[in-house]
A protein has these predicted regions:
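Eukaryotic scaffold repeat domains enriched in small/polar residues
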Residues: 1-361
Length: 361
């Protein structure tokens, strides 16, 4: 548990449990990079896999109660496939939007994983490729040409984050164009904001993006090591953080979300922690991981005596071997107000319950 008293309010975060383990398919994740929360606490987890194991590239659908539901998607450039999946979001109907920074496109699926369309390349659901036309690569992008990139309105160059507002506006962090673009649900360009730089309102390879309940936009300004806040129209509002490993400082933040209290959660990638900020950007606390082996992990461990011995040896040398975050990459708030932290190299989700009570100071 991590607790930090701040003003007249305390916020405490009690570790609940973990979901997942390192696995290429089924009840686990392999180099996960983002997740989205659906109804009934269903989680859609984007697996990036390895360059030498492209079967790890897919979306896993689970619940935070450790129920495995299904997985969908595969490696490739065809309709419904992806090479470097990076970010995921759901619209109000439960459709899934996936950003691919290699193919420079957004692919859309229904909640069951059926491909519907993609843009800006214009693939529609039902399109197929015969076996002779399929491109197979064993290194990311080795045999698959990168999707067309551009800097014009509606064109993408390494889309890295995606969020969808209540009115159906899609916000995409267009990383190498150093901007945020806005689209309709079917991919029509609506507007953009942000330019390259380190000044207020400027961006340098923005990554994660999230909206608060008022519709304000929070961007993980990755290379500037800060979080920036904008209105939905792109007007700059605030900037939080700077480079470093101290309180309120960041080292390549790549995920951000905001809860109903307005508290801001930042996946501080290279500092291996999640920082919690008050609505005005002041530091509240930092979470560094409290992992206890998930049920899926226990099931695998109990069936493999050699793995039991190897794990015991690793833990004896470093008691924090398992518990700590290992490059946290995404943070989300579920329907119960719990914080879910996606651990990239840990291949798991760590879940925390928040308490916020008045205290006497």
């Amino acid at each position: 548990m991590s607790t930090h008293f701040f003003g007249l309010t305390d916020r405490s975060f009690a570790y609940s449990h973990s979901v997942g383990r390192n696995e290429f398919s089924g009840t686990g994740f392999r180099n996960p990079v983002d997740m989205a929360v659906g109804d009934n606490d269903v989680m859609y987890v984007v697996n990036r896999g390895y360059e030498y194991r492209t079967d790890g590239v897919h979306i896993t659908v689970v619940t935070l109660s450790e129920e495995y539901i299904t997985e969908f998607g595969s490696y490739g450039a065809g309709p419904g496939q992806f090479v470097w999946p990076t970010a995921i979001a759901l619209d109000g109907q439960g459709n899934v939007y996936l950003a691919d920074e290699w193919l420079n496109r957004i692919s859309v699926f229904n909640g069951e994983g059926e491909f519907l369309r993609s843009w800006p390349d214009g693939f529609e659901g039902g399109a197929t490729q015969d076996d002779s036309s399929r491109m197979i690569a064993f290194g990311a992008g080795a045999d698959i040409p990168a999707g067309k990139s551009g800097s014009g309105d509606g064109e993408l160059d390494r889309p890295a984050g995606i969020a969808i507002s209540k009115d159906g506006t899609i916000f995409v962090t267009d990383s190498r164009n150093h901007r945020v673009q806005k689209f309709t649900l079917d991919g029509k360009f609506l507007g953009k904001f942000g330019t390259f730089g380190s000044g207020l309102g400027e961006l340098n390879m923005p990554w994660g993006i999230s909206l608060d309940k008022e519709g304000n936009v929070f961007v993980a300004d990755w290379r500037n090591d800060r979080i920036q806040q904008f209105t939905a129209d792109g007007e700059w509002m605030a900037s939080f953080g700077q480079s470093g490993d101290g309180v309120g400082q960041f080292n390549r933040p790549n995920g951000v979300c905001v809860d109903d209290d307005g508290d801001i959660y930042v996946a501080d990638w290279l500092n291996n922690r999640v920082q919690v900020l008050a609505p005005d950007g002041r530091f509240v606390t930092a979470l560094k991981g409290d992992h206890v082996l998930s049920q899926w992990g226990k099931d695998k461990l109990n069936s493999n005596p050699d793995m039991i011995r190897q794990r015991a040896l690793a833990v004896s040398h470093n008691p924090n071997y398992e518990r700590s975050f290992n490059h946290p990459c995404a943070v989300k708030i579920d329907g119960q107000g719990r914080l879910a932290v996606l651990d990239h190299f840990g291949g798991r989700i760590q879940v925390y319950a928040k308490s916020k009570d008045p205290v006497l100071v």
